[in-house]
Structure formats: structure tokens, C-alpha cells
């Protein structure tokens, strides 16, 4: 009986190991800018870098640049922790509302989905002027984030803010987003409507 169980376990493990490379090959996901792989030349030959779906890489998207628009400042966890609660700063969760409600958010953040940023520039101190916005004289530092370093939501929201007239030098981009925040075990709060 024990021999039969050991044989079944060995056969099962062998089948898993054989299938693993095939699964990994089928599960390639986008790196950035519509590229699925990137080849670099090293001293001992070519090396191809790719992304495969793993539990930490389940969030859709592709790698975002450290600076999503000229003039924007990239920030990390310590910067976010130190800015929470400051009167001259605003932490904006640019994820869609369902993500915020389902997963939670960073304490002190306000949810303005990236698709709604251009319609809510008054939240950042801009005044509506005709069909556009007047952001002259705004001083609020806006710290924006979304799901992760592969999420295009906050970069798109940041570009919309700049397009509407918000000064890029007052925008800070937390590229790691909610995923990095939770990976580091930092405090989260429930999302609200």
C-alpha cells in the first residue's frame, strides 16, 4: 500500500514539474509599452527578461515609468507615511471605486478615480472657468497612487491633472501603490463611498 501511494505521489510530482514550464510560457504578461519580453546582451550571451503570472503579479497592467509625466516627483512608503495628515498635502487613491471598497485603501486617502479626475479638479483647489479649470495659485501637494507598479490608472489620472492645468511640480507619484503598501504590512483602512 505504501509503495503504491509513493508511486502515485512521485507520478503526480513528475506531471506537475513537466507542466510547469508550459504553464509559465502560456502565462506571459506585458512588461511595458506593448512588449512581452526584453532582451539584453551580457558578457556570456543574450538574456531575455519576461513576466509570468505569479500570485504577486496577478494585478493586470504593465510596468509604469518612475516618472509618469515631466515634473512629477516619484515617492515611496516613507514619503507617504510622513505626508499623511499634513494640511498642505492630499493623498489621492485613483483606483476605481470597486477596488477601494473591495480591498481597502491607505489611511488618509481620498478616492477620486482616474476617470473622474478631470471633472473634479476643484478637489485640488482649481476653480472652474468656462469649460475648463483655472489652477493658478494652487499650492496643494497631490500624492497619487493606484494598484501597483503595473497599474496605469494613477499615471493616466496624473496626466489628466496636468492637461487640465495642475502644476506637475506639485504632483507626487507613489508608483508601488496599494500592492507595495500591503506587501510591507502597512496599515490599511476600509474604503468608503
Give a label for each model feature.
Residues 1-9:
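Bacterial N-terminal signal peptides that target proteins for export
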Residues 95-98, 116, 146-148, 175-178, ...:
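A mature extracytoplasmic/lumenal domain signature
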Residues 67-144, 191:
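Positively charged, proline/Ser/Thr-rich regional signature most characteristic
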Residues 126-181:
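Catalytic cysteine-centered active loop of the rhodanese-like fold, especially the PTP/DSP P-loop
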Residues 102-105, 124, 155-158, 184-185:
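Short, solvent-exposed loop/turn and secondary-structure capping segments
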Residues 184-193:
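Active-site neighborhoods of enzymes that stabilize oxyanions during catalysis
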Residues 23-103:
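Flexible, polar/low-complexity N-terminal or interdomain linker segments that lie immediately upstream
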Residues 19-21:
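N-terminal signal peptide c-region/cleavage motif recognized by signal peptidases
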